[in-house]
Amino acid sequence: DEHRWFKESRKSRDNPYHDYYYWRPAQYIGKKRLPPNNWTSQFEGGAWEYDSNLDEYYLHLFAKKQPDLNMDNPKVREEVKNIMRFWLDMGVDGFREDVITYISKTPGLPSVYPKLPAANGMQHYSNRPDVHRYLAEFRRDVLSGYDCFVVGESPLTTPDIALRYVTEGENKVLDEMIAFSHMEADCFMTDFVPRPFDLKKMKRAFTTWQKKLEGKGWNALYIENHDHPRIISRYGSEQYWKESGKMLAAMYMLQRGTPFIYQGQEIGMLNIALPRIDMYKDVMTMNAVRLASKIMPAKKVLKLVHDRSRENSRTPMQWSNEANAGFSTAAPWFYVNGNYHTINVRDEDADPDSILNFYRELIRFKKNTPTALYGTYRELMPESRELYVYEREYEGKRLMVVCSFTNKLVRFELPERYDLEKAELVLANYEHNFVIANGFTTRPYELRVYLWG
């Protein structure tokens, strides 16, 4: 709401920028003022914010400081094209298009279940028919003239929805689409409604996307971003920090698709545990605190924030063991994780066995191994609640990835058609990797990657 366009849009109803956003008149029942419809925000409360100067509301599907651009207005789409050209001419490699399936709304912005005071209006703004048309317009008028990459992102995206946008051919409008389902293995819909980690649920999510997109589109692979806690603290183990950090890296990066690495992930950055709730700033965290405080004691609310806040992944990058983790000589926008003395780029760069150097090795391996790039995907042992095992196969060569998600010792055995003695161990996070009777006992959070052929 601090952008020049928006400031202009709220000056008057006939301002040229007024229709750059979804401004609608207030409704009145007697003297009672009501918003234009009953849609709720994705964060909390209603999706409309009142402006007394205009006696109108503007639409914000997320925070009130994030008014929705009216992409249904052709003038706005032309502005977006100019922005794209500006950055592409500056040399950027592409764009991550946030909640891209929300960019078109049902004409008239009708209420959902009009008799209800509030309702989720997603049916009127998610995956509307014009979304594909607008993205095709961007691709035709701008992106096709550059060597660039575009990845889309949006909640509740299924493989079938993604294929509308990423299927190879003339209807392709995005290079990849980010999925969320594998990040729901320890929660119900949102990180702030936790449940015990379910490895089978995570595996099903990965496998579904791998198989559904095979031969049709390309996967966007990730396990960390700015909207989730740190992955070692979440799906791995801080006790087995190095082992689980390496295992998680190979687990997702060796699947079929393009791996995304979030800042700090490559050095194994962990969640931050601040001593007081008022030290947190994020709007989603504060909304969760307000709701949780109604049903939970303060200590449990603080523990929930420690485990689930997005700010776990928004602490300054840990470059060295110097002040402010070497990020800046000035005070940064948020607290530095106190473990920067031991988890930082400079120290890990000098340590051949570090998580950072494992990521480098893993990237080299993926880039130089056609099976890891182009191979088909097949999950093995889908019923296991402790091991995630899958294979990739390409031109007669087979790659097998074995990942332990527990601190327990687990016996792993392969069928006779797989002979581990004839395979090359190409990646591992432990030394002394013995094979006994065509199998082995996995150590806590162990990783092994074997290659045949």
What does each model-identified segment do?
Residues 1-85, 89, 102-160, 165-167, ...:
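Acidic/aromatic-lined carbohydrate-recognition and catalytic surfaces
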Residues 95-97:
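Hydrophobic residues within beta-strands of alpha/beta enzymes
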Residues 123, 133-145, 149, 156, ...:
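Loop/helix patches that line or flank the sugar-binding groove of alpha-linked glycan CAZymes
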Residues 63, 172, 311, 442-444:
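A short, structural micro-pattern
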Residues 120, 217-239:
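Active-site clefts of carbohydrate-active enzymes
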Residues 4-11, 110-115, 164-171, 236-239, ...:
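Short secondary-structure boundary/capping segments
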Residues 409-430:
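Beta-strand-rich binding/interaction modules
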Residues 434-453:
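C-terminal beta-strand-rich structural cap/linker in extracellular carbohydrate-active enzymes
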